[in-house]
Amino acid sequence: MSLLVKVCGMTSKEDATMCEQLGVDFLGFIFHPSSPRNVDAAFARSVKTDGAKKVGVFVKQSATEVIETLKNGQLDFAQLHGGQNEEFCKAVGKERVIKVLWPQKYDSVKEFQADIDRFVPHCTYLLFDAGKSGGGHGIAMEFEVFKDVTIPVPWLLAGGLSAENLREALDTAQPNGVDLNSGVESEPGKKERNKLAAAFAAIGQ
């Protein structure tokens, strides 16, 4: 199957349309007030797509709030980006969960593998971000860590990905998909066509 591409931090309908025209599979909408890319459910609902799935990114909300926002924003998936546990995933529903983990926060590969195994039964996708929490900070990670773990569900790689490092990331980590954000922006929340096109060229799609 071809590589899945998610572009996160949608703040305008124009950017969403541009991403779809380029062939993006997932559009990410961030629901986190301290983020420069924060939006509300009404905006997410107003973005109509032609095949791309809409993903809500949640950090501090309760499971009830996540479910309500999924409904009100007409979102397909909840990306749980705040350390939510298995019970939280169950409440939202496995079929709608993209669970985020941060490989760099673990002291050993064994610990990292244990958390992968813990969440696999409760999500449709895993997403691995750089740093030890949060996201959208433009920091990349060491890709070699993925050679030492087994990931039995489709997974996406995030964290400072751009045209400059995408090829290395794909060749080394071999993910099922990538999550682009700050590396394809001219400023926080504003996607840049040239950077997106360069990223797609690097991916080979």
Curated annotation (Swiss-Prot):
Organism superkingdom: Bacteria
CDD domains listed in its UniProt record: PRAI
SUPFAM superfamilies in the record: Ribulose-phoshate binding barrel (SSF51366)
Enzyme class: isomerase
GO biological process entries: L-tryptophan biosynthetic process
Catalytic activity: N-(5-phospho-beta-D-ribosyl)anthranilate = 1-(2-carboxyphenylamino)-1-deoxy-D-ribulose 5-phosphate
TM stretches of this protein: none
InterPro entries: Aldolase_TIM (IPR013785), PRAI_dom (IPR001240), RibuloseP-bd_barrel (IPR011060), TrpF_fam (IPR044643)
Enzyme Commission (EC) number: 5.3.1.24
GO terms for MF: phosphoribosylanthranilate isomerase activity
Entry keyword set: Amino-acid biosynthesis, Aromatic amino acid biosynthesis, Isomerase, Tryptophan biosynthesis
Pathway listed: Amino-acid biosynthesis; L-tryptophan biosynthesis; L-tryptophan from chorismate: step 3/5
Family (UniProt): Belongs to the TrpF family.
Protein name: N-(5'-phosphoribosyl)anthranilate isomerase
